[in-house]
């Protein structure tokens, strides 16, 4: 599979160009240098052919901080792995000394290079490309990523580089996992440790990740896509427009995921902000795993079995609304307890896709009501005629979580306390570990005295 890396100095429009070429907004775009930090990957297709595009951060050579060095290393790896380079420059500012440094860097890597002169926002500005011939590369394209000018011609060039024709897509459908938590909880470190390479920038400075970066791995032959997100900060700390946009993309990643990994700094413990993040997961009705990271830094060392048990009790006490979520204690740095982590992931993924036949559901609820009759409400007792599970082929249940419709005599006859009892009995029978359950109580046609036109939805 041909890989093309988009490279250039900061703020020349690489991420906007990447989004244009991919046909959707993947990389975060903001008018500030240094927004992109990790390598962002997208597979683009045309007439059955595929090419992988890689967006990179702004390339600079004066790496005075550890974070800057990490960013440089990420870009260097992207260049090494690429078959071809799109070298993006800014047509409005013209040729700068840093552009010449980058050109020298790319020549030393012995890579095929196409120069893309961006920000030529009006037809007829192609003459601005002339000075970039001094970079020493033969192919030069004039584009405006902002106004979609020259993009089709550039795509033609990209697919002429030898895109592969594939019967099966390179990125097979997979379970999408949003990896969320506070800044510096160890989200990127955990993903890097799982895949065995420094795919994501890791630094002690909170807020290193800006984009929601997707990384694919297989676990026992099952494909998963991890979405590494920016750490969610307190609202009063979202002072800049960029941080607000980053936070919004993180919430969006939760909504489009199938499952959430909630990473908590085990050394700091669960904070008020962690509880607010847990509330976002609950509100989104997402299957979830809670992962207590950095257990290698705890003074009170626990063996892993004891740690998992104590971690579960601690999370249930602090985050009772996520009581359905399994808890795993890990060390991303030391790669501790990864076997339990991945086996739990496989189990939760299976549970979220579980299907219970209508006849079994109906039998369960009718037997439970006969054995444990519900309390009367205004002289009426709840009756469940039959129950069914909603689902679609994708496996999300037509909903973020397993969803059930119960056809009853009167939805108003169900008390919340009795529903909690029913759910406890239900989980003992069918489990659904790691999954919230969504219940829709619907009046059966021709049953009962009143007619309700909407479902009564109670969920946990």
From Swiss-Prot:
It comes from the Bacteria. GTP 1 binds at residues 8-15, 55-59, 118-121. Residues 2-166, 175-353 form the EngA-type G domain. Associates with the 50S ribosomal subunit. GTPase that plays an essential role in the late steps of ribosome biogenesis. NCBIfam families: GTPase_EngA (TIGR03594), small_GTP (TIGR00231). This is GTPase Der. It comes from Methylacidiphilum infernorum (isolate V4). The lineage of its organism: Bacteria, Pseudomonadati, Verrucomicrobiota, Methylacidiphilae, Methylacidiphilales.
């Amino acid at each position: 599979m041909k890989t093309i890396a988009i490279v250039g100095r900061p703020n020349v429009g690489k991420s906007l160009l990447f989004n244009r070429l991919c046909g959707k907004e993947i990389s975060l775009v903001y008018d500030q240098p240094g927004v992109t930090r990790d390598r962002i990957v997208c597979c683009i297709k045309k007439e059955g052919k595929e090419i992988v595009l890689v967006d990179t951060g702004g390339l600079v050579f004066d790496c005075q901080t550890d974070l800057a060095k990490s960013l440089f290393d990420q870009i260097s790896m992207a260049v090494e792995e690429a078959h071809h380079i799109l070298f993006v420059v800014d047509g409005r500012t013209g040729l700068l000394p840093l552009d010449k440094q980058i050109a020298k860097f790319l020549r030393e890597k012995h890579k095929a290079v196409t120069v893309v002169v961006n920000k030529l926002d009006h037809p007829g500005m192609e003459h601005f490309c002339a000075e970039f011939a001094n970079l020493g590369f033969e192919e030069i394209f004039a584009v405006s990523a902002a106004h979609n000018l020259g993009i089709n011609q550039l795509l033609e060039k990209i697919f002429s580089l030898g895109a592969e024709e594939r019967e099966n897509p390179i990125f097979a459908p997979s379970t999408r996992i949003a990896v969320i938590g506070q800044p510096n909880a160890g989200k990127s470190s955990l993903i890097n440790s799982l895949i065995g390479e420094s795919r994501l920038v890791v630094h002690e400075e909170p807020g290193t990740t800006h984009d929601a970066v997707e990384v694919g791995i297989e676990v026992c032959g099952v494909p998963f896509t991890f979405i590494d997100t920016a750490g969610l900060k307190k609202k009063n700390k979202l002072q800049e427009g960029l941080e607000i946009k980053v936070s919004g993309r993180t919430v969006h990643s939760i909504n489009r995921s199938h499952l959430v990994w909630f990473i908590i700094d085990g050394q700091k413990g669960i904070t008020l902000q962690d509880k607010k993040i847990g509330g976002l997961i609950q509100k989104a009705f997402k299957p979830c795993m809670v992962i207590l990271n950095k257990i290698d830094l705890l003074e009170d060392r626990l063996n892993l079995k004891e740690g998992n048990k104590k971690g579960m009790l601690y999370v249930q006490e602090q985050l009772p609304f996520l009581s359905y979520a399994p808890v795993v204690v890990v060390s991303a740095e030391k790669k501790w307890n990864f076997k339990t982590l991945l086996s739990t992931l496989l189990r939760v993924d299976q549970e979220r896709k579980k299907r219970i036949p209508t006849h079994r559901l109906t039998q369960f609820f009718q037997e439970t009501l006969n054995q444990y009759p519900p309390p009367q409400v205004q002289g009426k007792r709840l009756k469940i005629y039959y129950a069914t599970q909603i689902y679609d082929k994708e496996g999300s249940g037509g909903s973020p979580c397993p969803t059930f419709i119960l056809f009853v005599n009167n939805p108003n006859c169900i008390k919340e306390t009795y529903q909690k009892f029913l759910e406890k009995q239900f989980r003992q029978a069918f489990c659904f570990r790691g999954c919230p359950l969504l219940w829709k109580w619907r009046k059966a046609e021709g049953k009962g005295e009143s007619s309700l036109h909407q479902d009564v939805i109670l969920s946990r």
